[in-house]
A protein has these predicted regions:
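Alpha-helical transmembrane segments and their membrane-interface junctions
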Residues: 201-212, 275-289
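Helix-loop-helix junctions that connect adjacent transmembrane segments
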Residues: 14-147
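C-terminal membrane-solvent junction of multi-pass transporters and transport-like membrane proteins
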Residues: 185-188, 231-286
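TM-loop-TM module centered on a large, flexible mid-protein loop between adjacent transmembrane helices
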Residues: 94-159, 178-226
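Single conserved hydrophobic/aromatic residue that forms the stacking wall/gate
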Residues: 1-10, 290
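Helix-loop-helix module between adjacent transmembrane segments
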Residues: 3-7, 22, 153-156
Length: 290
């Protein structure tokens, strides 16, 4: 599907609503119903509510918080297609960030309320949480439906993530910074060779399933690898933005950080770079597989 181009992917934006927004809202509503009807919370809201950051395992997991916002920068590729990007693009970023935090934080609370701590894992908790809530409200027949909706949402997300970054690499290739192999397109004008290499890399990483002690340990390692790759990109992006502000002062830009001067660029770029660097270092701290 990604080989059909971004235009075809946009037609599947409904996947984000069906597979992410609606299930997240439903999960939060079910948690409220559960507590309001006398259900016992499996999460203790006491002095141990905040994580123990003296434990290195928790520090490693904390670095994964950067994945909350991973992909939001993809909107920058399409900023030229927006009306009044100087006003609407920051608004879209802040709205997207707020929705992301609400979904992840409140959704995590909802799962912690219904699933005992010893039964929580990284790969199955979402479906287990929905299943437990549906059993509580005597609607177990909804479990397969929500599973299909979540799968549809994941597919829509993958389509966007696959098509978007490869378009950026393709733009670099067309500028002459990559060999001609990376500049070839199919009948739809999509960077076919770049997509094939992406697929090959993911396939090779998937083979780690056969050598890891458990699916959860593989998921955690793959998650940390994703964080590292993203953070490398963010380090380059933040430093590159500051560099280009001085090296290409007169380049036309549909969106500019700060109406004048470079102070705001240094503030945003500097904070982003330092935060990414800290998370990058934390990602190398060994963690347990439990």
């Amino acid at each position: 599907y990604a080989s059909r181009g971004l235009g075809d992917v946009y037609k599947r934006q409904v996947g984000g609503m069906v597979g992410t927004i609606i299930p997240a809202g439903l999960l939060m509503v079910l948690a409220v119903i559960y507590l309001a009807s006398g259900g016992q919370s499996q999460m203790n809201f006491d002095g141990n509510f905040f994580p123990d950051f003296s434990n290195f395992d928790n520090l490693v997991l904390a670095s994964s918080i950067f994945l909350f916002y991973a992909g939001m920068e993809m909107g920058g590729i399409h900023v030229k297609d927006m009306e009044n990007p100087a006003k609407n693009y920051p608004k879209a970023v802040f709205i997207g960030a707020a929705i992301t935090v609400i979904i992840f934080v409140l959704g995590t609370f909802a799962l912690g309320i219904i699933i005992p701590e010893k039964d929580i894992n990284l790969t199955q908790s979402l479906l287990v949480g929905f299943d437990n809530y549906f059993k509580y409200v005597h609607a177990s027949w909804l479990s397969p439906i929500i599973a299909v909706a979540l799968a549809f949402g994941v597919l829509a997300g993958v389509l966007t993530w696959v098509a978007g970054p490869s378009k950026g690499i393709f733009a670099v290739g067309k500028a002459g910074y990559l060999p001609p192999f990376f500049q070839k397109t199919n009948a739809n004008g999509v960077q076919k060779n770049i997509l094939l290499i992406q697929g090959l890399a993911v396939t090779l990483l998937s083979l780690l399933f056969v050598v890891m002690p458990s699916v959860q340990s593989f998921y955690q390692i793959l998650s940390q690898l994703t964080v590292l790759l993203y953070l490398i990109m963010y380090l380059l992006m933040f430093s590159g933005a500051i560099y280009l502000r001085y090296n290409m002062k007169k380049a036309p830009r549909p969106f500019r950080i700060g109406s004048k001067g470079n102070g705001l660029m240094w503030l945003i770029g500097g904070l982003g770079f330092c935060g990414s660097l800290l998370a990058f270092v934390l990602s190398f701290i060994p963690f347990s597989y439990t």
